[in-house]
């Protein structure tokens, strides 16, 4: 299991050091520790120091770019993740579950962020006592323990520890929650207004050939839920999943044909740990008791019948050796009543470009020499519209034989619908103990489709 | 609020000040001081001098202060064991505290203090805490047992904590179960033999129930533990799989990977015919693909594991090529791994897409990545024959870019392509030669030199090119030196007249001026060969090279199976067994996949069925010999080339005319050679007569086994024998026999797929052999060979292939290739398949020849227990093309005079003596006369085989 956890700043100085096992640190270090046990450094501390230094020297101060997130130095393995300029490193001498260690490091970042916001050197120094407390709680002898902030916040706070003034009932409530089946939610939450927000966030990825043939396209989506619900509400989420719709439609043939069109085929999905997976596996129903506040309910991936919000039609003509003519048409492909936002088209230019002249019908376009691209920005664009840009690119004559590789034209945008076609059908809330019903809950649903890597070759 | 100030105190006398503050009466001040101490400790300052003062602060109601003191204690207790005892009382008291959080804190911290004296006091509180009413305390105590075991294993056993821990597996609280499982698993690792976890269907059921209820981390512990269980049969395996599959939808990638591990392992036990098996395969692909949308570090772990899964079960992800396409902003470690998997998944179906991608990657910026992409193009060419041409042209385009490292990498892979497809793409050599000057890496230089040497006859200025390398011979790396030596020797053998000086130069450089033993040895070998027997030298140095395998970097199957058991762990990331990076005995228990249950596949014995690889009997992986030692390798693999014993040839060190004698015969060997006798060595002429003595005694054993009945229409056909057992060929079993019918020879093969995957892309090749046997047509296996399917093929053979004397004479070395690997085996063919139809000699001719052949070439044999009369024998032999020229009766014995001719024109004359009237004597006597006496033994064996069947 994890032998120790260290947090460094960008210089490689240690901000947090928590050692769980004394096997970390090389054998050499152990020898020298014995040797110096009467000296100024106590043995165990020195060993850990050794691992700490090994990572600094070999990874943080390494001249080369990081070639692997897992490094083995003298039979000691170091896992690291980086958040802005802070390094988090987990150290072990055993054959640990590597995926678990990384998941834990991410979780650790989430927990810290939930307590004090951005992970920065200053914030870490300001909260070091809190971090040690958290590390003591969520990692015991290197085994990850309950790390849900909802539960942790009941007894570890930035203001110090609550539990000393708690009643016995409160204490046992804390412990049963931390160890219980629903570790992510505490009991006794109350809201005057029961409200929930659902965001369907999708990023649509495309690679298209110059002729308009789709080489690859997929949507990766997330359903993010923000819940402000009292008690321990039982929720059931429904969407237009093809498998569910077809199953339900079996009874009435009419409905199948009607709803069949609107349903979508989901390639794969994963769920937050609150979702009962066995139920999803057997009935494909998504039921759960949500954590309080914001969390990611599910992630999914689709590859079929994707609505591509924009089509890019490029035309590049080489006029002699020193001139390029580029014409790019973009067409919006969704309901005219909807508006796309933050549209940006990036047209790469050759390295030996000396000057560019651009004319565009809509928005603003600029040649950015430092980025070797023409950047065309349009604030808003309605559906079923089309716009065009033409540019003349002057080139410096070069004797470079290497042909310009013509990188693809990329696009960014945001649209108010889900390109996968996913629709939330319902989100039912039941709280049997409290006196509010599904109808009393105010629900909000929002769809945002953003461009992922949306490229057209030219 | 701003704790960062604690980090900034660096003034002198700090310790003294802290001491005063720690002993302050004010609570707040104390707490501040302890915080300062912890901050100093964190940045690496030694604050152990404050030990007594800090421990004094322990007795407090303030939980925060208490935790800080505990943190200090954990770090320094070991250095001050005597003082640490001071803390014991507080711990023991805290373990009785009404607040469960404090009880847990005390037992958790005590376990972290690795001082023997303290551990003694720990036992009682721990025992209580293991049975605490509060689950939070119990789950903490469970982990504490593992801590204590790490300090003092004996104590844990003596105190019976292991049993208590086992009881906790049945606890009502899922988190307690999970921690108990984690603790037990770790303890069990250090006691491989003790059946600590004692997994049985009941406990497995409990674990599976807890699996649904515990935290994500607990699920990982439980799944990792489940993976160590060995279900008793396929039904149990299936039911566990069914209950584990829902985990594939978990958001935590580690849960998914651990579930994949359980499924991959238990799948081994399921029969492939089951519907469920197919369903499971289908279910595995989407979650693996989804792992690729996780954070980059996890993607890396996932990709390393997918790399293993793709090797073990290629069918899972064969349609998912696109998701492994590299994204522009992937970190380099993700890019390199994706590339690796892309090559593994490349097939005829997707090769166009893959190539287009690889071409894009070759223009990226990261040098390592670009190199790997270029190399990948070469690997595609070798793997997918149909794409070879396109790959080569892509590589040529890349060479045109003149980017130094791209050119060098391209040359290295083109060398491999030449090896794989000889005489196909040599037209590009000219382009390669243009880039000679830009090569500065040893591997590329060596590759280029290999190409120049190998194709010396097509490169007009090969001698100049090689000479240019020779100038800086001693500054080159060893691989370049070795290659240069070999290349120049090759050149010399091909163009002996112009290059004599060059070869002497390189030989003396290698043998006299070099300290490298490898180089010297190789130099001497060539030298001796060239000076004693240039013809043999030619056969050695210019011998045909073994095929290179299309799949490179494959993990050895036993290791792969072991790594599959370690999916998700560091071992799977490093692709090394834990013993390679874990110290001591911990966690190095050898794991292996479960055996397939005997009920599902009765044909295979349970020991060999599961992975096909019990230790010691694993199939040999012959990796691509992409290295440049091709010639030497061939020397090792090939038959011994006989020449005069070395003792007779004195090595003339440094003699200028060391090649004097050899050169003539060498040049004479080439038809256009100047001078020299026009002596063409017959295939067997190079073999001294003394080697013709009884050889191949194994052959008779082989035929003793055969008892089937041959067909009468053609020559005798032996029943099929197993030539290549499945175990040695990753599941491909080959058996076969040879037939001769109406003048055509064929090899009747029976291919059986005993592996778990479909086999395709079969091809066959023979090594050079004594009679030039070679496939007359490619091996045609029309449909892919599914598991457990058998196909029968008749492969027509010709006798126009390259000739090389084998030992024994009728030995045939065969290489069979399929989509998995290349396999080598050798077999002995019966000589009678080489007896041609026009082997009947005219009487006069027979007499003349009989007299003409010297008597020492006559060999006598006895064929025992063969009660045939002359007519029967004669007709039997005739059907196998042994013709009776004359028959005589002398003193009651029938004498048959017979003749036969081999495919290479060698005549064999025979006298067969039969005693028909004497039932007590059923032995036949056979005298054979032949100009090539070494065939006699085999002709005799052919006689025996034909007559006795």
Swiss-Prot record, chain B:
Biased composition (Low complexity): 594-611
Lineage summary: Eukaryota, Metazoa, Chordata, Craniata, Vertebrata
Distribution of this protein across tissues and organs: Widely expressed.
An annotated Gene Ontology molecular function: protein kinase binding
Species of origin: Homo sapiens
Protein family (similarity comment): Belongs to the adaptor complexes large subunit family.
Disease: Keratitis-ichthyosis-deafness syndrome, autosomal recessive: An autosomal recessive form of keratitis-ichthyosis-deafness syndrome, a disease characterized by the association of hyperkeratotic skin lesions with vascularizing keratitis and profound sensorineural hearing loss. KIDAR patients manifest ichthyosis, failure to thrive and developmental delay in childhood, thrombocytopenia, photophobia, and progressive hearing loss. Low plasma copper and ceruloplasmin levels have been reported in some patients.
SMART domains for this protein: Alpha_adaptinC2 (SM00809), ARM (SM00185), B2-adapt-app_C (SM01020)
Modification 3'-nitrotyrosine, positions: 574
Quaternary state and interactors: Adaptor protein complex 1 (AP-1) is a heterotetramer composed of two large adaptins (gamma-type subunit AP1G1 and beta-type subunit AP1B1), a medium adaptin (mu-type subunit AP1M1 or AP1M2) and a small adaptin (sigma-type subunit AP1S1 or AP1S2 or AP1S3).
Subcellular location as annotated: Golgi apparatus; Cytoplasmic vesicle, Clathrin-coated vesicle membrane
Task performed by this protein: Subunit of clathrin-associated adaptor protein complex 1 that plays a role in protein sorting in the late-Golgi/trans-Golgi network (TGN) and/or endosomes. The AP complexes mediate both the recruitment of clathrin to membranes and the recognition of sorting signals within the cytosolic tails of transmembrane cargo molecules.
One Gene Ontology cellular component annotation held by this UniProt entry: cytoplasmic vesicle membrane
Matches recorded under SUPFAM superfamilies: ARM repeat, Clathrin adaptor appendage domain, Subdomain of clathrin and coatomer appendage domain
Name of the protein in its database record: AP-1 complex subunit beta-1
Domain of life of the organism encoding this protein: Eukaryota
UniProt gene name: AP1B1
